[in-house]
């Protein structure tokens, strides 16, 4: 038997997001909102269940692509609308001692606060916070510090609307109690929905113990629209960057830097202003200069930028990447590429110098092709390498060349028209200066 099971409620339409995409698939620091919740859930339990409805297949496929073991259920929103109906959908074969019920739109929640809900002897523990502006939240009604009920904003009377103790939306139930009490919940309210919060009052009437656990309002912030999404992302960004800086990463003007929640750093790293790190990028002992973007790539013992762009699947080791250089699916090891180049679908080996304006022409209109450049190659400025092509070790390519054939070790490659100087032709074409 699992000590704790977790049910994540993610069946809502999320109409205030004004999007055809499910609310829980909107990204926060690079990952879908629901992924943040699932990762934290798996730190607590290996029995994690999620209840869906709106955009069911889309959300299901997204979740299962990353979390293979999660159990997915569909809510009957016609006959059993509301949070109690959602939780009810996930009760099948639930046999843990306790069940933690949380919302899928709370990506900032911390694991320690979820654990604190379950670490007591109450039959039901509910999360609550003191709000400066409680409008819109369910109110936690107390009598001599004991929880009596939770009342939703639209169902609250004038006195209840003055209460500042608000429901944070996470609950830990004794599992047997949860299974027995959900069928008793009625939909006698303004929305005609089955509220999970009504389980509190029903449990109290049966003599069960209910406790509220104070939590941080920010951590339990619900994302209901895109403005709230932007606020939550800023909070999460600050957490990510604070943690990285405390672990040795140097950031200049960190408010201008964006770091994906999946990115990893190791060793001595420095990020200058306006740097963007996306996906599961890995940065080790490297200096990322202003305005550079790194996507799903690996950078070790290198300096990048300013204004460089590493697109997905680039692997950079002991390399200098200068300004306005773009890489895509490129592997560079001990290479210098200082200026204004595109290096895509390529492998470049140690000691090679890439001249300004070098391009790997990797796409023929139908397929992508690979360029392989050996060791100690010198590529002059404004060179085009038409893939598929292999440049052997110790090759010298003259500036302005278009390389379409493989080279041999030690070759000089030059492909350009012969230069002709015609004496006096300027004056013939434009006339002499005194005639202008």
Curated annotation (Swiss-Prot):
Assigned protein family: In the N-terminal section; belongs to the N-acetylglucosamine-1-phosphate uridyltransferase family. In the C-terminal section; belongs to the transferase hexapeptide repeat family.
Protein name listed in UniProt: Bifunctional protein GlmU
Residues the record lists as binding UDP-N-acetyl-alpha-D-glucosamine: 9-12, 23, 75, 82-83, 138, 152, 167, 224, 311, 328, 342, 353
Transmembrane parts of this sequence: none
Residues holding acetyl-CoA: 362-363, 381, 399, 416
Acyltransferase listed as a keyword: yes
UniProt subunit comment: Homotrimer.
Gene Ontology BP annotations: cell morphogenesis; cell wall organization; lipid A biosynthetic process; peptidoglycan biosynthetic process; regulation of cell shape; UDP-N-acetylglucosamine biosynthetic process
Binding-site positions, Mg(2+): 105, 224
Any single Gene Ontology cellular-component annotation: membrane
Molecular function terms from GO: glucosamine-1-phosphate N-acetyltransferase activity; magnesium ion binding; UDP-N-acetylglucosamine diphosphorylase activity
Subcellular compartments: Cytoplasm
Location of the region described as Pyrophosphorylase in the Swiss-Prot/TrEMBL record: 1-226
Residues annotated as catalytic: 339 (proton acceptor)
A Pfam family of this chain: Hexapep
Function noted in UniProt: Catalyzes the last two sequential reactions in the de novo biosynthetic pathway for UDP-N-acetylglucosamine (UDP-GlcNAc). The C-terminal domain catalyzes the transfer of acetyl group from acetyl coenzyme A to glucosamine-1-phosphate (GlcN-1-P) to produce N-acetylglucosamine-1-phosphate (GlcNAc-1-P), which is converted into UDP-GlcNAc by the transfer of uridine 5-monophosphate (from uridine 5-triphosphate), a reaction catalyzed by the N-terminal domain.
Gene3D superfamilies linked to this entry: Hexapeptide repeat proteins, Spore Coat Polysaccharide Biosynthesis Protein SpsA, Chain A
